[in-house]
């Protein structure tokens, strides 16, 4: 049996599908369906059982779970604007620590979601404490458990892998609202208004030039399954493509894929801007000083751990996402 927490969420539900594609259905899905629409992410998934996150936590603390092959811990509050530190640390740090201790006590492999938010204001994205400067309590809540793992690395009884997700996009993120990817928002904007919006330049960046390491959720699933297949490997690893691309690339990929659907030719960025299909809005004052304008994962350690598969660039991955999303809407 494999536990997937956050199973009705974005990455969690895609992980369940990835396991299903391997013929694995002995899955305990753990989530909080207070926002009931998230169940839609599990409709086409095969699982053995569902547990509410609070009931699951009680069973963890009571030591009453069935024998497990692995725990894939994706459940967390991922809202980077959440200011309630007490809630964030309990939900993201304390629960992760409890699961870690349970898995160590029972020699169960434990893969968990960390985040590139731990780097915050750093300009170097290498898995080293000198580069970790979170800008918000979300990033700190993720860093705190990474620090615990580092102190325990030499005494582990079973595999523990922390994956620092960079900017993930792809199917089944619709419930995330404002925290959904820019690709998701650009798709909705273009279909509703005929154009997309990006932040104008700030902090030395041109309009739409702020750059992130955008990674398809399909590649995130592949990384998780790689470590599931290699239980002898533990550590903290960046989960990105190793390639920074500007938000302009995302917008252009969205608009051109939707244009092609209509039988219209793809256009270069300057023409998209000239025709008003890509527009820029002033950079929000409340984000100044709290915004990562550039991220690019150093994937040296990930590659050294044996993950050799190529990863999608924005042009490929976003186009796949748009086509998938439009097919589901048809």
UniProtKB/Swiss-Prot annotation:
Residues holding NADP(+): 10-11, 31-32, 38, 53, 74-78, 91, 142, 168, 176
Pathway where this protein functions: Nucleotide-sugar biosynthesis; ADP-L-glycero-beta-D-manno-heptose biosynthesis; ADP-L-glycero-beta-D-manno-heptose from D-glycero-beta-D-manno-heptose 7-phosphate: step 4/4
A Pfam family: Epimerase
Subunit structure of this chain's protein: Homopentamer.
Binding site for substrate: 167, 178, 185, 199-202, 212, 291
Enzyme class, spelled out: isomerase
Gene: hldD
Record note on cofactor: Binds 1 NADP(+) per subunit.
Domain note: Contains a large N-terminal NADP-binding domain, and a smaller C-terminal substrate-binding domain.
Record has Transferase as a keyword: no
Catalytic activity: ADP-D-glycero-beta-D-manno-heptose = ADP-L-glycero-beta-D-manno-heptose
Known role: Catalyzes the interconversion between ADP-D-glycero-beta-D-manno-heptose and ADP-L-glycero-beta-D-manno-heptose via an epimerization at carbon 6 of the heptose.
GO term, biological process aspect, one: ADP-L-glycero-beta-D-manno-heptose biosynthetic process
InterPro entries the record matches: Epimerase_deHydtase, Heptose_epim, NAD(P)-bd_dom_sf
Cofactor(s) needed for function: NADP(+)
The species this protein was found in: Bordetella petrii (strain ATCC BAA-461 / DSM 12804 / CCUG 43448)
Alphabetical UniProt keywords: Carbohydrate metabolism, Isomerase, NADP
Name under which the protein is recorded: ADP-L-glycero-D-manno-heptose-6-epimerase
């Amino acid at each position: 049996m494999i536990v997937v927490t956050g199973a009705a969420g974005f990455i969690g539900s895609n992980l369940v599908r990835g396991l299903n594609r391997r013929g694995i259905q002995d899955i305990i899905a753990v989530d909080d369906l207070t926002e009931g629409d998230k169940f839609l992410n599990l409709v086409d998934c095969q699982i053995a059982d569902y547990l509410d996150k609070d009931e699951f936590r009680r069973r963890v603390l009571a030591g009453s779970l069935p024998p497990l092959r692995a725990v894939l811990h994706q459940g967390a509050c991922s809202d980077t604007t959440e200011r309630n530190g007490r809630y964030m640390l309990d939900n993201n740090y304390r629960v992760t620590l409890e699961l870690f201790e349970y898995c160590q006590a029972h020699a169960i492999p434990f893969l968990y979601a960390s985040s590139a938010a731990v780097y915050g204001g750093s300009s170097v994205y290498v898995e080293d404490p000198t580069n970790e400067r979170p800008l918000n309590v979300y990033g700190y809540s993720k860093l705190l458990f990474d620090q615990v793992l580092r102190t325990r690395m030499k005494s582990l009884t079973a595999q523990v892998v922390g994956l620092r997700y960079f900017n993930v996009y792809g199917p089944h993120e619709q419930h995330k609202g404002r925290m959904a990817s820019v690709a998701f928002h650009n798709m909705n904007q273009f279909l509703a208004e005929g154009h997309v919006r990006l932040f104008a330049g700030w902090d030395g960046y041109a309009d739409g030039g702020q750059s992130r390491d955008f990674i398809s959720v399909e590649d995130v699933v592949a990384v998780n399954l790689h470590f599931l297949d290699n239980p002898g490997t533990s550590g903290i690893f960046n989960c990105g493509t190793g390639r920074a691309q500007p938000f302009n690339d995302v917008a252009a990929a969205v608009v051109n894929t939707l244009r092609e659907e209509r039988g219209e030719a793809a256009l270069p960025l300057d023409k998209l801007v000239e025709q008003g299909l890509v527009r820029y809005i002033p950079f929000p004052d409340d984000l100044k000083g709290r915004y990562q304008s550039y991220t690019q994962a150093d994937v040296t350690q990930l590659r050294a751990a044996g993950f050799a598969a190529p990863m999608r660039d924005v042009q490929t991955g976003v186009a796949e996402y748009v086509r998938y999303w439009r097919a589901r809407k048809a």
